[in-house]
Amino acid sequence: MSFMLALPKISLHGAGAIGDMVNLVANKQWGKALIVTDGQLVKLGLLDSLFTALKAHNMPYHLFDDVFPNPTEALVQKGYAAYQNAACDYIIAFGGGSPIDTAKAVKILTANPGPSTAYSGVGKVKNAGVPLVAINTTAGTAAEMTSNAVIIDSARQVKEVIIDPNIIPDIAVDDASVMLEIPAAVTAATGMDALTHAVEAYVSVGAHPLTDANALEAIRLINLWLPKAVDDGHNLEAREQMAFGQYLAGMAFNSAGLGLVHALAHQPGATHNLPHGVCNAILLPIIENFNRPSAVTRFARVAQAMGVDTKGMSDEAASREAINAIRKLSARVGIPSGFSKLGVTKADIEGWLDKALADPCAPCNPRTASRDEVRELYLEAL
């Protein structure tokens, strides 16, 4: 079996990594940066260290801080207009998945005709575009190092998933010092997103030895450190360990692919503007229990990675404990038990079925689902 690993050219980790990145970019003399971020992060002062470092090197930038959760094509077009009007030369994304995905889509438009959603699917971005630096503030989406971007087509009410090595950031930055003020609810949701990445990658039909190693270590780290990061956001060690865990999960799914959890989670996220990590967390134990008969031994290893003592257990029994461990972690960090608590009703489900089955994440799932089975999975998730 052949496989591909596509990663950022440079990855910087640890407290102070933002300063290291600015020193590096200063030597490259890329020109003027468009900083793509969320206005709330600016108000919280999380970008202050970036602004200070850029000014110290006399590096020009233009701030675009209009990003909102679940970015749309209209937002991407607005960001690209800001890039053009300010005569920028490269992009710095600062934030979680939404700012980084927005920046990736703007990067596409710097070298390819729009809209960015035209590149939904795998390997459709012909030209790489301008350099992109991605500074991650959550642990997380791993958007700072993956080939994925998710942009909503508002007219169709669908999340378009763009998967292409040409949108991988040139420089990925995981500086835990800017993660300390992230609220507990966001920490929980993004942490469960990272767990979903790791579990889906490990049981994916595209899994291979390199992704297996990364996925299992990611599961171990996230299970151990996510509750600590949720309980005390200023626990720097917990933030750093979660940053490592989510990055390893990104390395795994960036090559192995994802599965039905993401395929189904994209739909309520698009129609109800729900947090992506929460959608994943609600669906993860339900869909992996559906997948479990097709990957019993792998789910037994997931249980071990999540700290379950499987000594004396059969793989069948251990695989069931993996699902229980996922449920326990999700409840421990305060994830809602179902979509009905978030305003979703049975009437919403029918419009999601075909879109979920057509999602680019679905083909890597270890078990094929019919339309009726997808409906039942959604109903169970209510």
Q: Regions from the language model: what does each represent?
A:
Residues G140, Y247-N280, D359-P363:
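Glycine-rich phosphate/pyrophosphate-binding beta-alpha loops
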